Regions:
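Ribonuclease/tRNase effector modules and their secretory precursors
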Residues: 1-80
C-alpha cells in the first residue's frame, strides 16, 4: 500500500493513531460497501467489530494509495 503525505500527517492525531494498519488493509481488500466519489476517489467501509464502528478508507483514483482513514460516525451500513 502507498500513502499520501496527508494520510501520514493525519495518522499522528490521537484519534487516528488508534486505527490499526491491518484494519485499513482489510477494508481496502474486503470492504462491506464502496462508492466512487465524483473526483474519482474510492470510498470503502468495513465494520470493525472490535470497535463496533465502520472504518472509512479513501483511496486515490489509482486504487492503491490511501488518502484518508477514519471511523465514520454517520455511516450505518447503507450505500451512500
Amino acid at each position: 500500500m502507498k500513502f499520501t503525505q496527508y494520510f501520514l500527517y493525519m495518522r499522528q492525531r490521537p484519534d487516528r493513531a488508534k486505527i490499526k494498519m491491518e484494519w485499513i488493509e482489510d477494508t481496502v481488500k474486503n470492504p462491506d460497501c464502496e462508492t466512487i466519489q465524483l473526483d474519482g476517489r474510492n470510498r470503502k467501509w468495513k465494520k470493525i467489530e472490535e470497535q463496533g464502528k465502520f472504518l472509512r478508507v479513501v483511496l486515490l483514483p489509482d486504487g492503491e494509495t490511501v488518502h484518508n482513514a477514519f471511523f465514520d460516525r454517520t455511516f450505518k451500513g447503507e450505500t451512500k
